[in-house]
Regions:
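Structured-RNA-binding interfaces characteristic of tRNA pseudouridine synthases
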Residues: 1-246
């Protein structure tokens, strides 16, 4: 048996998220079906992150074990002939038996894109959060720095997931102005459920003047979800990269 690592890009608009669901289309289901068509095997697929409905990925990672004799690097081409156009395997490699896409990861990079203009673009609505107001990017940048470092982010998670600890480390959080698009890029050692989207919603609230940048440390310390901003819409979020030590 060989352990195969896949690097996957997908547009999440038409899917109910990564995880397999009985009554809805998922990214995992599409990949499992493609693997079955190519190998004739029913496998278990392990994803690095369970992206929600509407969330996209440029660098999602998954792995599975197979007895197939297909060369590891050829899996990408073979699977892409069976996948819908909005899902593509960008790379495939054989990895050590103990590699696990989720548990071997040491960090992730996410990007969130805002579209700041009076009128929403018909071309970018499914990749961005449309914001009509002019945002104070300087205040947002100040607030972003307060999120960096190791903190208890219990106030920046949605209910619905059980975790042993709500402490996470954010290594970098940057805001780039490509008007009318504004991109937030966040790298950390792990993220709680909806953590990136809630941080984004909070930074947008700072940009609108609804929350003061200097209040962010206190909001983090409080652990009170009600003090933060809204959960930003799913469609602006993209999993850019999963980081491994080797």
């Amino acid at each position: 048996m060989r352990n195969i690592k896949l690097t996957i890009s997908y547009k999440g608009t038409a899917y109910a998220g990564w995880q397999f669901q009985k009554n809805a289309h998922s990214i995992e289901e599409a990949l499992l079906d493609a693997i079955h068509q190519v190998t004739g095997e029913v496998v278990k697929l392990y994803g690095a992150g369970r992206t929600d409905a509407g969330v996209h990925a440029q660098g999602q990672v998954a792995n599975f074990t197979t007895a197939s004799r297909i060369p590891p690097e050829r899996f990408a081409l073979a699977l892409n002939t069976k996948l819908p156009r909005d899902i593509r395997v960008m790379e495939s490699h054989q990895v050590p038996e103990d590699f696990h896409s989720r548990y071997s990861a040491v960090g992730k990079i996410y990007a969130y894109t805002l579209y700041t203009a009076p009128i929403e673009s018909p071309f970018y609505w499914d990749y961005t959060w449309h914001i009509r107001e002019v945002l104070d990017l300087r205040a947002m940048d100040t607030a972003a720095r307060a999120f960096c470092g190791e903190h208890d982010f219990r106030g920046f998670m949605s209910t619905g997931s059980a975790v042993k600890s709500t402490v996470r480390r954010i290594d970098t959080l940057t805001i780039e102005d490509h008007s009318p698009e504004i991109q937030l890029t966040i790298q950390g050692n792990g993220f709680l459920y909806n953590m990136v989207r809630i941080i984004t919603g909070t930074l947008v609230a700072v940009g609108m003047g609804k929350i003061k940048a200097e209040d962010i440390p206190g909001i983090i310390e409080s652990g009170d979800r009600e003090q933060g901003g809204i959960t930003a819409p799913a469609q602006g979020l993209m999993l850019k990269k999963v980081i491994y030590s080797q």
